[in-house]
Amino acid sequence: MTRPPLVRGIFSLGLSVAVLKGVEKTVRKHLERQGWIEPQKVDYELIFTIDRLKNLVDNKREALTAEQPDAGELSWRKVFNFISRQSSELDARIYVLILLLSFLLPIAWTVLDGDRETTLEDKDNDCNVDLIENERRLKHYNDGERAVLQFGKNRSEPIILSYKDMNVLEGEHEFTSKEEHSNSHLTSKSENALSQVGSEDLLGCHLEKQLEEDKNEPNGEADGEDDNNREKDCSSSSEVESQSKCRKESTAEPDSLSRDTRTTSSLKSSTSFPISFKGSIDLKSLNQPSSLLHIQVSPTKSSNLDAQVNTEQAYSQPFRY
């Protein structure tokens, strides 16, 4: 038993030999005439005479076709005759060249077309990769940078991607300094008002003692009344001076007083007393303003405790948390 590969090899070899023999038989006539297989003697005189006769026949044919009326017309029969005549006169080398070209041209076309498509695809891939990398560079921001781009205060302002302390701005710093100055001024005014109330309490106690002495000594009523009038005049003059000072301070700093109108009104109401005392002096009314005095240094600020913030808003510059 022979192996299958050996049978296949013998069959392919025999087929190739048969093809070569068939090609040799078909081309032998042309090859023998040209002298490729066996060199033979050539009679050049016979060749020249044959060429002359051929030229004469061609000239006669052209003259006859020119004399015919339908010589200018073209038909498929004439075309076929011309092609067959020219193909019969071709050399065998031209036949081989035509066969090779007919086999090689489609292969070369497909190879070149495939290379061109691969180059175009490579260029497209390179362009796509460059575009993707550029988009990644443009979109590669962290949370803080995206927050600056999304939640910027003003589009005309430049975008600052570096770190910047946004806890206290310049305008807020000026506002806080003004607020501290106004608070210090209000505390100084409240202290002055408290000192004035304390001095008036002492003055009221002194007046009460003098009234008791006047009741015990009926003989010195006239002297006591003169002393009371003098003390009333002194207290009224001191109150007028204090009120004039308060008015000057209020006109000197209208901004600080306009921010806290409630506190100033409460201070004025607590420190204001009647200029002239008529009749009996109520010591409880004198002592009452000191206990009801309400001092408010800064206004209350409302806070929203229900706010929910994500990471981009937490990193954003316009917000403070």
From Swiss-Prot:
Keywords: Autophagy, Membrane, Nucleus, Phosphoprotein, Signal, Transmembrane, Transmembrane helix
Region (VAC8-binding): 233-321
This protein's name: Nucleus-vacuole junction protein 1
Composition-biased stretches (Basic and acidic residues): 174-183, 242-262
Disordered as annotated region, ranges: 174-194, 210-275, 299-321
Biological role: Involved in the formation of nucleus-vacuole (NV) junctions during piecemeal microautophagy of the nucleus (PMN). NV junctions are interorganelle interfaces mediated by NVJ1 in the nuclear envelope and VAC8 on the vacuole membrane. Together, NVJ1 and VAC8 form Velcro-like patches through which teardrop-like portions of the nucleus are pinched off into the vacuolar lumen and degraded by the PMN process. Also acts as an outer-nuclear membrane receptor for OSH1 and TSC13.
Chief location bin: nucleus
Composition skew (Polar residues), residue ranges: 184-194
Membrane topology: Single-pass membrane protein
BP-aspect Gene Ontology terms: autophagy
Localization terms from the record: Nucleus outer membrane
Signal peptide range in chain numbering: 1-22
Region described as TSC13-binding: spans on this chain: 73-125
Low complexity biased stretches: 263-272
GO cellular component: nuclear outer membrane
Subunit structure: Interacts with OSH1, TSC13 and VAC8.
Transmembrane segments: 94-114
Gene: NVJ1
Organism (species): Saccharomyces cerevisiae (strain YJM789) (Baker's yeast)
Region (OSH1-binding): 139-195
Residues with the Phosphoserine modification: 156, 199, 285, 298
